């Protein structure tokens, strides 16, 4: 197809007229479409319905270490749930805390805790004149909503094909002690579907922050969300890299089963260094006696182990893959060669991002 920039004004006006007519035809159909991003379909939710049968009134709800999951206790989760999520997050079990149903909730609490009580003895952020966060863009709007909610100044960092602009990240983090963190979705990122390169992860692990309480908020939400068995992105494990680089405490790693089992009814986890986890437990001991152990046990008995999760995710992929391929086929057929936008073909996650030309975003959304 001929690029729009190579068409004459008359040709563009004629094209515009035809496209507007097509647009009116579609509008006249009165379609009611759920355009929510990252929301699993009913077919995907049905994949986990067997979980509802794993715990019945006649089932023993005692977990492996003898704790009765119906009762109080177990501040940081039952052992088998910690093992399941640890394997999914590629970290040792002892470096994991299991929380409730939402990793976003855990991230919110982590920022709130830093605001009110500081991190590992540092000054609470609320007592500082200025607190700043790096925000790779485009990124996850709910991450940015958290920092905005707490009045934290957000600094945009452009995304590249290999992750955030690390030259910019390194320069800012090393020179400004007011910068306390960065949001990251390192694998099949929201919304572009980019996975951080080896070099990007190495550079993150070797950051030299001016702030001793700087933390990388590593939201690995799509760690097992591949579309293909034979074509999968690989992401280096950040916790070990930080430890090898002499920065063991610099990262908080988050994940959950929200897009594996039931969104809103899954289990969430954080992985971090021993020192970070003990700092977090000091607040948790006041905040809660423990999270929902019955739900943790239900997940463990349904999936069994990491291999069960892997097999389960293949079923998700079978449902999602045709949808991704359809969108990509239509984009290429209708817009390929026109030079009016760009996109990538992700190997996993939930998103395809269309990057329009400068100045076009508002007009596109307005339609």
Each PLM stretch: what is its role?
Residues 2-76, 80, 86-87:
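N-terminal "arm"/small-domain region of PLP-dependent enzymes with the aminotransferase-like
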Residues 16-27, 276-277, 281, 287, ...:
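Conserved C-terminal alpha-helix-loop-beta "cap" of PLP-dependent enzymes
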Residues 67-212, 223-246, 320:
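Conserved core of the PLP fold type I
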Residues 41-46, 105-107, 143, 190-193, ...:
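Short catalytic/ligand-binding loop motif for oxyanion handling, primarily in non-cytosolic enzymes
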Residues 314-328, 340-356, 362-365:
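Conserved glycine-rich beta-strand-loop-beta hairpin in the small C-terminal domain of fold type I
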Residues 219:
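Glycine-centered flexible beta-alpha turn that most often forms the glycine-rich phosphate-binding loop
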Residues 99, 240-321, 333-334:
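Conserved core segment of the aminotransferase class I/II
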Residues 181, 215-216, 252:
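Hydrophobic "anchor" residues on beta-strands that sit immediately upstream
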């Amino acid at each position: 197809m001929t690029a729009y920039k190579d068409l004459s004004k008359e040709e563009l006006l004629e094209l515009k007229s035809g496209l507007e007519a097509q647009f009116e035809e579609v509008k006249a159909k009165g379609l009611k479409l759920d355009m929510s991003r990252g929301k699993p379909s009913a077919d995907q939710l049905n994949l986990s319905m067997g979980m509802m049968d794993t715990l019945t009134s006649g089932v023993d709800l005692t977990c492996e270490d003898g704790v009765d999951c119906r009762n109080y206790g177990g501040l940081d989760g039952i052992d088998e749930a910690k093992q399941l999520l640890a394997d999914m997050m590629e970290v040792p079990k002892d470096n994991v805390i299991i929380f409730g149903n939402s990793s976003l909730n855990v991230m919110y609490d982590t920022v709130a805790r830093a605001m009110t009580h500081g991190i590992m003895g540092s000054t609470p952020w609320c007592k500082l004149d200025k607190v700043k966060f790096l925000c790779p863009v485009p990124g996850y709007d709910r991450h940015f909503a958290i920092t905005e909610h707490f009045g934290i100044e957000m600094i945009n960092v452009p995304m590249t094909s290999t992750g955030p602009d690390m030259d910019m990240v390194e320069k800012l983090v090393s020179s400004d002690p007011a910068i306390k963190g960065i949001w990251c979705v390192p694998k099949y990122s929201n919304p572009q579907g980019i996975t951080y390169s080896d070099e990007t992860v190495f550079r993150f692990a070797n950051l030299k922050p001016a702030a001793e309480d700087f933390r990388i908020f590593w939201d690995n939400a799509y760690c097992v969300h591949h579309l293909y068995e034979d074509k999968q992105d690989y992401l280096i494990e950040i916790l070990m890299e930080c430890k090898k680089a002499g920065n063991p405490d610099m990262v908080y790693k988050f994940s959950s089963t929200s897009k594996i089992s039931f969104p809103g009814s899954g289990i969430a986890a954080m992985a971090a260094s021993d020192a970070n986890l003990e700092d977090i437990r000091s607040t948790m001991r006041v905040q809660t006696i423990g999270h929902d152990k019955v739900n943790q046990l239900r997940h463990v008995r349904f999936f069994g182990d990491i291999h069960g999760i892997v097999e389960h995710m293949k079923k998700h992929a079978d449902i999602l893959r045709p949808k991704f391929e359809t969108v990509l086929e239509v984009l290429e057929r209708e817009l390929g060669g026109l030079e009016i936008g760009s996109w990538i073909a992700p190997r996993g996650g939930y998103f395809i991002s269309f990057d329009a030309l400068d100045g076009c975003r508002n007009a596109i959304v307005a339609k």
